[in-house]
Amino acid sequence: MYITCPNCKTQFIVTSNQIGINGRRVKCSKCKHLWYQKLDYNTSKLNDFKDKINTEAIKTPIKNHYNTNVPVILPLKKKYKIFPILWSSFIIFCLVILLIDSFKFLGKYDQLKIEEINIGKYRNMGGMKIFYKLSNESDYLITNPIIKVRVIDANHHTLGEYASITKLRTKIYAKQAIYLELNIEKIPVTAKYIDITICNRLGLLFK
């Protein structure tokens, strides 16, 4: 098949395989014009030229009344999917932050202790109010602990999990304790036990 430069009207001999089904970018070797050439199934074949041209015409410029030459076939432009790359980078960044938080948690919150747990009714028969004492046995200030409560049935299966970030401004000074409460609605009727633990943000994400 042959193609024509839109700028200088110079014709070039190419093969269908060089252009491809989806087309590709080409560059005129005469005027250096760039354009996107699509495959035209209606173009004349090489055998339709009055002066038959052999396959060497693909490599060597040919001078005839068609003024045929050889174009510069540019490499296919790679398509980069930006959104998946950015999304993956965001997920990796969040995981790194959570892992850093986990390491801080291991060395910081292991001195907290939950004591004096009491349970009462909350609003209606399906609700529960949990009162507990949170003690800081360390020599430093601890802020914003995350408390996770699991509701368990008689077979020790977890029926639900509830988290309390203790009002986001909780401060527990060294060797001191505070009293907190957590309200839970719609407790399953098959609930038998509750489990109260101290967790970090990574634990909340994969709970």
Curated annotation (Swiss-Prot):
Keywords: Membrane, Transmembrane, Transmembrane helix. GO terms for cellular component: membrane. It comes from the Bacteria. The keyword Membrane applies. It is found in: Membrane. It is a single-pass membrane protein. The chain crosses the membrane at residues 82-102. InterPro entries: Znf/thioredoxin_put (IPR011723). Its main location: membrane. The keyword Cell inner membrane does not apply. NCBIfam families: MJ0042_CXXC. This is Uncharacterized protein RP193. It comes from Rickettsia prowazekii (strain Madrid E). The lineage of its organism: Bacteria, Pseudomonadati, Pseudomonadota, Alphaproteobacteria, Rickettsiales.
